[in-house]
């Protein structure tokens, strides 16, 4: 595999952004891992999954279409003497994946009123997919309310939107594979400019809000 070798760098007159290769999806994976490490004595068991092959369909033994994560969770439940089916049903998952930030240079690919913007906080998506909701996970209104209440209570900046213009934009995440196991899941992540290019750009505020949201999610419970 050949990837750009340059280091990440500050971008902008105010140095408010970070430019680098591979923000998709390291910019979500890293704060998720750091949030898991920072979590102490959570009310419920927390699991942080850094899974592979998302860009090619989550196939293979290390992708989310595999059972490796769910077998691990089943083993946790059985060790604790609990029913794994009930545990899955009572779980909640954040599918941490980036989204395309509104780019005025390519405005035709976006719906400005329903897009997400760099610098306005972590982005939340009720549903993903393309061509409407094809190949999508569609989070319930109750789950959207739970997550937004949680962030509002701790002043975490967030925004909600869609993955680009209808029938033009769109994208897939691992959320549907988690939902297929009966676990309520919603997509959340950092908006990215120039996604899938050798030099992707994100806003530092959004990255910090992602970390805060993940820590809060691990510690909060209703």
Task: Please give the residue ranges for each predicted region.
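Soluble metallo-hydrolase cores and metallopeptidase-like ectodomains found primarily
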Residues: 1-20
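A glycine-rich helix N-cap at a beta->alpha junction
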Residues: 66-94
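Acidic, glycine-rich active-site loops and adjacent beta-strand->loop/helix elements
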Residues: 6-8, 50-57, 98-100, 164-167, ...
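Flexible, glycine/charged-enriched surface loops at secondary-structure junctions
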Residues: 42-48, 81-90, 151-165, 222
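His/Asp/Glu-rich mid-to-C-terminal helical/loop segments that flank catalytic regions of hydrolases
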Residues: 36-50, 190-222
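Short acidic, glycine/serine/threonine-rich loops at helix termini
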Residues: 13-14, 58-63, 104-107, 199-200
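Alpha-helical metal-binding/catalytic segments enriched in His/Glu/Asp
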Residues: 19-65, 71, 213-215
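Active-site-adjacent substrate-binding region
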Residues: 101-106, 110-197
